[in-house]
């Protein structure tokens, strides 16, 4: 579901939940700027709920399609991604992004109720570490 539709920001927060729910306060821990927000959450949240390649591919297509629609609609320059899912699905999703055609993506690491740091996917070395 899309939130903050009237926002004038060129930043998009993408919250993907397949294992645990991502709470608003956790999203707020990565930025104090009002951003566009899109949430993807399965009806049933469980660890390793994505059972096969077809399910993973279907979910990835839905997510990437909606992200790209919003990127185009609002001229998004940076995607801030928070994910509560299996490592396997997280990497599978990441492989679907294009460094040529998609905007900058920062993926955040969750620890004890907050997303405390992130990795900017278009930077190298220590320049890639983002502390919100």
Residue ranges and their predicted role:
Residues 1-80, 87-132:
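Long, low-complexity, Lys/Arg-enriched
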């Amino acid at each position: 579901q899309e939130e903050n539709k009237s926002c004038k920001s060129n930043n998009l927060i993408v919250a993907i939940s397949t294992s645990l729910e991502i709470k608003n306060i956790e999203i707020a821990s990565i930025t104090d700027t009002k951003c566009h927000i899109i949430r993807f959450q399965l009806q049933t949240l469980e660890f390793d709920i994505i059972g096969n390649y077809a399910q993973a591919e279907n979910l990835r297509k839905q997510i990437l399609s909606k992200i790209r629609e919003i990127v185009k609609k609002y001229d998004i320059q940076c995607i801030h991604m928070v994910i509560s899912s299996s490592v396997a699905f997280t990497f599978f999703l990441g492989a679907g992004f294009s460094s040529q055609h998609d905007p900058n993506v920062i993926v955040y690491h969750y620890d004890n109720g907050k997303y405390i740091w992130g990795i900017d996917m278009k930077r190298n070395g220590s320049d890639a570490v983002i502390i919100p």
